[in-house]
Amino acid sequence: MSQTVKAVRIEAFGGPEVMKFVDVAVGEPGPGEARIRHRAIGTNFIDIYQRAGVYPNPLPLQMGMEGSGTVEAVGKGVTHIKVGDRVAYADNPPGAYCEARVMPAKPLIKIPKAISFETGAAMMLKGMTAHYLLKRTANLQKGHTILFHAAAGGVGLIGMQIAKRLGVTVIGTVGSDEKAVLAKKYGCDHTIIYTRENVAERVKAITKGRGVDVVFDSVGKDTFQGSLDSLRKYGLMVTYGNSSGKVPPVDIALLKGSLFLTRPSLFPYTQSREELELTANDLVKLVASKAIHIPLERTYAFADVQQAHRDL
């Protein structure tokens, strides 16, 4: 039996004002699907990219890539979740900005009562991103030293906590003294205020001329060259975002010093259920046990989604 729910849809790319509430019909799940009732929805910088058309999707587009809630129904063949389970997810293509939805069951991860729905909706995209970057892309080990750009951002604050559990020394870039205090609270050993310091020079000073083993760079165009200059011989450059703009085509000669460059993204690392659980189950355990803390900067009513985007 179908039900009508509110959802947020865009029919053109643009600012927050292009997001409109619409009524959508939600039916019964088919094979391999589940219907969930959202209790919380996550907002992320990638939502802005998609809304603005930087990462274009076919229009009209129902927004949102992560959420949490309870399972209302499951389709044939779904065995890893059942009706009544508390679940959270991050998934692509988008569709999370709604009261309820039918979706593939594969990305749904059970969360215990120790994790609130608000935390569940805030931890999946940023938390799984931080987890796979550090533990799978870079395979960080005790004794490594890393540079994390935007250390006071969502991925940075989670990533630094994971890094410290691995015995890694963290150098983080931030934009202000206030953000430096926040980054240190979450485990950053050394902060660089990029608005008034040369990042590569400070990295070399901190590491006594050696450079870092890995750079995690979500900023893109503005930080790319400085990131390469911060690496040690055989160092790894992990570029996973472009908040300052896309990195221009790279001259391979920039990698002199036997450097390595990679551009990973989350969803290839979670393509199968087995790969998803490698990251998601460990993240859930860490959060439920309070080994790491998921920062919740603020919450909004569903009706205030446009303001949430303005504040991102």
Which residues does each PLM region occupy?
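N-terminal Rossmann-like NAD(P) cofactor-binding module of classical short-chain dehydrogenase/reductase
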Residues: 88, 147, 215-216, 238
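Glycine-rich beta-strand-centered segment in the early N-terminal region that forms part
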Residues: 25-42, 52-95
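Glycine-rich phosphate-binding loop and adjacent beta-alpha segment
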Residues: 174-177, 222-292
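NAD(P)H dinucleotide-binding glycine-rich loop of Rossmann-like/cofactor-binding domains
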Residues: 49, 80, 89-152
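Short amphipathic alpha-helix with an adjacent loop that forms part of the alpha/beta core around
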Residues: 198-209
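Mid-domain Rossmann-like dinucleotide-binding core that forms the NAD(H)/NADP(H) cofactor-binding site
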Residues: 121-197
